[in-house]
Amino acid sequence: MAPTVKTAAVKTNEGNGVRYRGVRKRPWGRYAAEIRDPFKKSRVWLGTFDTPEEAARAYDKRAIEFRGAKAKTNFPCYNINAHCLSLTQSLSQSSTVESSFPNLNLGSDSVSSRFPFPKIQVKAGMMVFDERSESDSSSVVMDVVRYEGRRVVLDLDLNFPPPPEN
C-alpha cells in the first residue's frame, strides 16, 4: 500500500497562479520560504528563491526532516525510500539552522562519543534507579540499591486467557 501524501498547493483567485505552503512572495519579486520548527516552536528561515517551486521544494525538504512521512508537502512524494529520504540528506543552500535530527548510526563507537554519559556496571542482584528532574539546573541522581531477595518466576503467557479463579 502506498503512503498517503498530503499536498498543499492551492489555486488562488487573485490570478497569481499557485500558492505553496511555507512560501510567500517578496515585494521585489523573489520568493521566501520558511517553516515552523515543531520542537522549538520557532520559525526556521529557509532562504529566498527565484521561483515559487524552488522555495516550495526547500520547504518540502525541511518538512520531511522535521515530520518524516507524515509531513504535509507541496509536491507529492511517491517513492519515500529513494526520493524523500534523499531530500533529508542535504540542507537547503541558505539554511541558517542545523537539523534537529542527527544521522542515525547505531555503531557503539558513535554512541559513546555522542553521548558522554558515565557508564555504570550493574551486577546481578543490584538495582539501579535513575531519577531525572525536569529542572534545567539540577543534576542526575543515581541510587544503587543492593537486592538480596529471591527471584519469583511467573509462568505467564499473555496470549492465553487468565486461569479460572478458585
UniProtKB/Swiss-Prot annotation:
GO biological process: cell division; ethylene-activated signaling pathway; phloem or xylem histogenesis
InterPro entries listed in its UniProt record: AP2/ERF_dom (IPR001471), AP2/ERF_dom_sf (IPR036955), DNA-bd_dom_sf (IPR016177)
GO molecular function list: DNA-binding transcription factor activity; transcription cis-regulatory region binding
Keyword Cell cycle among UniProt keywords: no
UniProt-listed PROSITE patterns: AP2_ERF
Motif EAR-like (transcriptional repression) positions after renumbering to this chain: 156-162
Principal location: nucleus
Signal sequence range: none
DNA-binding region: 19-76
Locations listed in the record: Nucleus
Keyword match Transcription: yes
One Pfam family named in its UniProt record: AP2
A cellular-component GO term for this protein: nucleus
Coiled-coil residue spans: none
Domain notes: Contains a slightly degenerated ERF-associated amphiphilic repression (EAR) motif, which may be involved in the activity of transcriptional repression.
Protein family: Belongs to the AP2/ERF transcription factor family. ERF subfamily.
Protein purpose: Involved in the regulation of gene expression by stress factors and by components of stress signal transduction pathways. Transcription factor that binds to the GCC-box pathogenesis-related promoter element. Acts as a transcriptional inhibitor and may regulate other AtERFs.
UniProt protein name: Ethylene-responsive transcription factor 11
Organism: Arabidopsis thaliana (Mouse-ear cress)
